[in-house]
Amino acid sequence: YGLLYRYGLFRQEFKDGFQREHPDAWKESFYPFIIRRGSEQRIVKFDDMHVRAIPYDMPITGYGTDNVGTLRLWDALPMHEFDYDAFNSQRFADAILEREAVHDITRVLYPNDSTYAGKLLRVRQQYFFVSASLQELIDDYRAAHGDDLRNFHTFNAIQLNDTHPVLGIPELMRLLMDEHGLGWDDAWEVTTHTFAYTNHTVLQEALETWEESIFKQLFWRIWEIVEEIDRRYRLDMASRGIDPETAHYYSPVHDGRVHMAWIACYASYSIN
């Protein structure tokens, strides 16, 4: 799974010895290798907006093989493309405000997150990606194995490549509990046997963390689940005799921030 970025990363140019970045409008050229699957869309729900996730399939071929893999890429589209009433009231910018906010989600890979608005967009991207993908995985499981999701992990393994998709952990918990009726213990059993995590750095400044306020603003329910994971983690560490200072350092939530790597380490069955 991935996201279908309109401009990708950037088109590189060197001028006077310096790199210049320009939009890479690759989709505007004919590109026949992505197939739109509009009938298989999913709805991703933020507290301030709902977004349509439209899947596109890209074939992944190998040399000398007899099969072809599929990479499913999600494009973000608004629920309503155009606010006619706002436009007719001559509030022209307002008429496309929601549309452009949604398109921002899949506009550029790694948008600048030096500001709070940039951080909000980064986290939106991450949640949009994991929510749409997990909804599809659950639907596929139910179609093949029925509605009892307690064996979901028997047929699905999800590799978290770095911290960017770690929001999949609380999102899978939310889907299992809120959408499909599992209790916390059953949902946690499934989740902790579904995810494996690849850690790319031990440098503290490179480990991804986000302000608590971002979670509270974008998805309060995910914040509640992360808080509960943190509470249970602390009880678990105390029961194992881990000293409080060490337990606090590795806790999923501390010092006003959500620590994505520590969530991944605590909730994954394998780490490399």
Where are these regions (language model features)?
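A conserved ligand/cofactor-binding region detector
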Residues: 1-272
